[in-house]
């Protein structure tokens, strides 16, 4: 597709995703964007042109697989800059690079870091300068050019228009492209849509029921309910709709109903209940019926889970 020709590569943390990309567009460069499990080294080399690494043992496995497949595999070494997710310790970089440099069929093309994904450490100018300095250190010490300095994910994008090191030239972008906003400040990007995804669930039961359950409540329940359920009037009733999704499919907290008048009541493994109030339109007609869809705006995490589920139907419009 022409619209994806001006990017460096397509990254995925799922090898099944990279395999599908190569089947559709063998010419597209692909990147495996998490450290490689050793047992999957052969598959990584087969379907990824690039991969990110923090383990010398894993890179040796990648090297052996690349030799066997007669391929030159490109890698980015990830450095720990405070997020405490993937990344080698900074003081070990020179020795690590030197060891990897000796491996056959491995080309070190860059350095990278992960920020903002677990603890939420911001990719500040100071952090990016540190990453740039490690590039300079490696290039001076080994007389080898590093083409890619991967400065993080979507959270880094708002900083580009501010003071930003020019040497940081690669970003692993997902959330901003798909959701149209920055995870750093929640602001919308001018040229991107914030409505690219919608999730809809079907009403499989619709009944007027009491607001609180009747009977002895034990600790054996496996569901999750709204705190407001326990504060409701003992005698009040309202219409409850059971929708055909549960916690196995997606976390309800990652879904925002497009109809602001409905409220979450509870969820179990495969069904979720919402309160519809009187379920009346201004003209007195029922607002919702059995079989009707209830529509939601999903968060990035909801989209990721739903798109990776083989049980969820996907429609591209």
Regions found by a protein language model. Name each.
Residues 1-133, 141-142:
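Active-site-proximal beta-alpha core segment in soluble small-molecule metabolic enzymes
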Residues 129-317:
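Active-site anion/phosphate-binding pocket segments in diverse small-molecule metabolic enzymes
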